[in-house]
């Protein structure tokens, strides 16, 4: 599949680096953003983090580094769905309050509902225009959104549906798509 659990540079266009669950993505993104600045390139580096992933110390070291080096060409999107493989993030090791932590590390912070295309569009445009600090977009989301039996279920972390579940999921998603296209 083009969309694996951990997207691969081999199969997923636009993915420049594969990282695991240890918070390595934001560190790599810092390196890419710094490299762009040193080379005089004018582009943004985007990285996506899970709210469970930000329990890792490496994430906060990178957050501190990004601000210290003035990496205003870096945008980190935190998928805040409150679920990870073992349960809710609050039950496992709460990173809350997420926005306040990024602010304390000197970041520009935007908080949105990821289910709103308008909010996503506005946040990405604001992040692209913002100068002076790295930007964190804290995107409140629903894990498995649009598939009734997957929504808010940590048991679907890294699990593939069987044939029957796949058909049911696709029916629900296609119904949502049809509804969106009608509006």
Language-model-derived ranges and their functions:
Residues 1-68:
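Cofactor-binding active-site loop characterized by glycine-rich and histidine/acidic residues
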Residues 8, 58-60, 86-90, 147-152:
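Short acidic, glycine/serine/threonine-rich loops at helix termini
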Residues 40-43, 90-123, 174-182:
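Conserved thiamine diphosphate
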Residues 43-47, 74, 133-139:
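Generic beta-sheet signal
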Residues 56-81, 136-138:
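A short alpha/beta connector and helix-capping loop motif
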Residues 69-92, 96, 100-102:
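Histidine/lysine/aspartate-rich catalytic loop segments that bind and position anionic ligands
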Residues 117-183:
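Glycine/aspartate-rich loop-and-adjacent alpha/beta segment that forms the canonical ThDP
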């Amino acid at each position: 599949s083009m969309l694996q659990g951990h997207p691969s540079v081999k199969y997923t266009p636009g993915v420049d680096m594969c990282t695991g669950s240890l918070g390595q993505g934001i560190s790599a993104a810092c390196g890419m953003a710094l490299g762009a600045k040193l080379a005089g390139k004018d582009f943004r580096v985007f990285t996506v983090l899970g709210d469970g992933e930000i329990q890792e110390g490496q994430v906060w070291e990178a957050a501190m580094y990004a601000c210290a080096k003035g990496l205003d060409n870096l945008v980190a999107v935190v998928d805040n769905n409150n679920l990870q493989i073992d349960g809710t993030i609050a039950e496992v090791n709460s990173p809350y309050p997420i926005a306040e932590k990024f602010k304390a590390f000197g970041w520009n912070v935007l908080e949105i509902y990821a289910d709103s295309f308008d909010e996503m569009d506005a946040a990405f445009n604001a992040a692209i225009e913002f100068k002076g600090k790295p930007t964190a977009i804290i995107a409140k989301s629903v894990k498995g959104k649009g598939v009734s039996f997957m929504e808010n279920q940590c048991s679907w972390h890294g699990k593939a549906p069987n044939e029957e579940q796949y058909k049911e999921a696709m029916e629900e998603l296609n119904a949502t798509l049809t509804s969106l296209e009608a509006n």
